[in-house]
């Protein structure tokens, strides 16, 4: 069965394979389009294991919020060329829709689940791996369910998909405050919600480092305890969302901004591609 240039084009669009590979597949398939798709898929899947050790430092953040449900995921690939492509972004959209519908918070359980089409999530990722010719992996997911939520996606470059994403769980819906706090989180990257959520071992380590630093600086023994506590307090303010100075008004903390608005934050998630 003969094939045309239009068949090659259609096969490239369907599989994201190169022109030469598409021609070879059509030759091998005797011009049968569906068989050619299967040939490319099989050949691509054979290369999946070879890509397992590769680094996936590129990709995108996808998120969706509606009502009292908000979800976010990070899908990784090897190059920004693939990250910018429609095929890769379509995979992310399909996974995001399934995540929103399932509200599954456990990554392993989500990857083991099935999409509405009946295809497994892992199978969809493996197919993307094969057709795109790069290692593709779902790195992490986040779900807020049962509370008002705000989301913010940030592009670090206009030609790239979102590289930073934030979800914020609020006591009540507030588009203005929610967006402001989400943008603040994107910019200042807090690690914890408040001082109470900073692990004791993290504080102990910071206190130990602060004391060693103060002694190395030659500070008098009588002043060291006060210096250490001051530095630990500064550290907590730096890493805790509610303790941080608010991006739009440095004279107020994020907690004060929320209090003024009659609102509160119970949780947040911040993803940045590759971090």
Name each region found by the language model.
Residues 2-275:
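N-terminal assembly/interaction segments in proteins that build large macromolecular machines
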């Amino acid at each position: 069965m003969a094939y045309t240039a239009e068949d090659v084009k259609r096969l490239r669009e369907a599989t994201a394979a190169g022109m030469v590979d598409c021609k070879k597949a059509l030759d091998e398939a005797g011009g049968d389009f569906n068989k050619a798709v299967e040939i490319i898929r099989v050949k691509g899947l054979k290369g999946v294991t070879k890509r397992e050790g590769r680094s996936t430092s590129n990709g995108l953040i996808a998120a969706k919020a509606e009502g009292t449900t908000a979800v976010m995921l990070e899908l990784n690939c090897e190059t920004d060329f693939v990250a910018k492509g429609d095929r890769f972004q379509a995979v992310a959209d399909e996974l995001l829709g399934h995540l929103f519908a399932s509200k599954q918070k456990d990554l392993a359980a989500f990857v083991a689940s099935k999409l509405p089409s009946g295809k497994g999530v892992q199978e969809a990722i493996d197919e993307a791996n094969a057709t795109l010719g790069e290692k593709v992996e779902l790195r992490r997911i986040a779900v807020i369910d049962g509370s008002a939520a705000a989301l913010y996606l940030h592009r670090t470059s206009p030609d790239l998909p979102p590289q930073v994403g934030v979800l914020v769980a609020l006591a009540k819906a507030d588009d203005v405050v929610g967006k402001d706090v989400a943008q603040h989180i994107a910019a200042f990257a807090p690690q914890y919600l408040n001082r109470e959520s900073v692990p004791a071992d993290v504080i102990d380590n910071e206190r130990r480092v602060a004391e060693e630093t103060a002694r190395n600086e030659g500070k008098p023994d009588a002043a060291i305890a006060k210096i250490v506590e001051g530095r630990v307090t500064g550290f907590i303010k730096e890493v805790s969302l509610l303790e941080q100075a608010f991006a739009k008004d440095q004279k107020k903390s994020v907690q004060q901004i929320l209090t003024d608005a009659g609102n509160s934050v119970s949780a947040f998630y911040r993803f940045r591609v590759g971090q």
